[in-house]
Regions:
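Phosphate/pyrophosphate-binding active-site loops
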Residues: 1-112
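Anionic ligand-binding catalytic core segments
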Residues: 70, 148-149, 211
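Short alpha-helical segments that sit at the start of domains
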Residues: 112-144
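Short acidic, hydrophobic short linear motifs in intrinsically disordered regions
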Residues: 147-161
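Core residues of bacterial helix-turn-helix
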Residues: 162-163, 187
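Short amphipathic alpha-helical interaction segments
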Residues: 164-176
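Glycine-centered, phosphate/nucleic-acid-interacting loop/turn motifs that mediate DNA/RNA or nucleotide
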Residues: 181
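Short, cationic-aromatic polyanion-contact patches
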Residues: 185-210
Length: 211
């Protein structure tokens, strides 16, 4: 552990090693030592964040790497164990790590873009009168993210979400949102669903072509 700390605490600028690779090696080294009975994963991810911040010379984190790792636990442990059990070749681990870092950056950019879309949506429609049920439904659909409100909004979902008294009220509210150009209607009859009137944000039934 002392050897690891001495290496890690060397000025990042002095290391003849790419900063991102240094971060990946730091995490691998610490997790291989596994110095504590509990909490090694959390500390290892904190070391990752610290190493990347040192390389970027910024305390701001826009990459969301820890979250990306937690969402890919199976692949993470496979890559980590492969490096730990190998003959010292960490190429595959570093390849997995750098690819995951790139994916985390792309995810963060998407989340930022979605947050901007939500802000612009409410700003553009701030003068449109909405009842509390309609506003709650729109907030839930926006929070789901682009194309991720599975199945679109339906009268049944609307009633469950907003506690609308009956199907007639739900249909009336949804039709009003269509007239106000906040939602678009898809399907027909019992298969009718509603999407946000935002390009790229609509749920598309499997087998249908995106428009």
């Amino acid at each position: 552990m002392r050897v690891f700390l001495d290496w890690f605490n060397e000025p990042a600028d002095s290391a003849a090693l790419d900063g991102l690779l240094r971060a990946g090696l730091s995490h691998l080294w610490f997790e291989t030592i596994h110095p504590f009975a509990d909490g090694n994963g959390r500390i290892g991810r904190a070391i990752l964040d610290m190493a990347i911040s040192q390389d970027a010379k910024s305390a701001s984190r826009l990459h969301g790497l820890s979250i990306q790792i937690l969402t890919a636990k199976t692949e993470y442990y496979a890559a980590l164990n492969g490096a730990q059990r190998g003959a010292g070749d960490v190429t595959e681990w570093l390849a997995w790590f750098t690819n995951t870092f790139a994916e985390s950056c792309e995810t963060s950019l998407r989340l930022i873009d979605e947050a901007l879309v939500r802000t612009r949506f409410w700003s553009a429609n701030k003068d449109i009168a909405l009842n509390p049920r309609q506003r709650k439904a729109l907030i839930r659909m926006l929070a789901a993210g682009a194309g991720k409100f599975d199945g679109g909004m339906t009268p049944r979902k609307y009633m469950a979400l907003t506690k609308a008294n009956n199907r007639l009220t739900a249909n009336r509210d949804l039709s009003d949102l269509v007239e106000k150009q906040l939602l678009v209607r898809g399907g027909a009859g019992r298969s009718t669903y509603y999407n946000l009137a935002l390009p790229g944000w609509g749920w598309v039934p499997r087998g249908s072509r995106t428009t």
